[in-house]
Amino acid sequence: SSNIATLFYAYLAYKTYFRNAIIQLNERVGFANFASYEERKTDYILEDYYHLLYKAAIEGFLEKGTDRYIEARVVPKDTEEGIVRSLFDYCKEIDEKYKKKYSFIFHFIKQRDEPKGEGFYRHYDLRHAIKKQAYAIYQFRSNRKNWEGDNNLVGKVVGLDAANSEVFCRPEVYAQAFRFLRGHEITIDEE
């Protein structure tokens, strides 16, 4: 019957629209596009399913062509264990055929400064959070287990950046973390 066909078509159209909105699949580019979705999507998705967003975004992009490569941005956790767990969860969901076609960039999120009062410098809380994240990245990169075999998680991380406009947060807030991590040479002892 035509009513069922019409309803099914409406369902498919809405489902496609919703999926594209969730994974930011549209014609707009830049941070404004990213920021407009990032805050909202976590409100509707349970934390247990959040890693599936990366599967949908990465595979959705890669399946549209054979010569594609994507660098997905992820916010680093503040412990080595948190970083390993999140990257492992993202990687295990993505189809094996795309294994060499994606990587990750650790993405520090800028925030508006909340003044703490006299005696505290600008972005006091954010600088401490970034310090914890930078140290966790250092530990993650230094741990031999994260380099080994098919679970070479460190090799999947190819960069580091800070997101958002400089209106709310100036570059020097991240300078120490970037200098610390840039100078981090990895040497893995052979046993």
Regions found by a protein language model. Name each.
Residues S1-E191:
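Metal-cofactor-binding active-site regions of metalloenzymes
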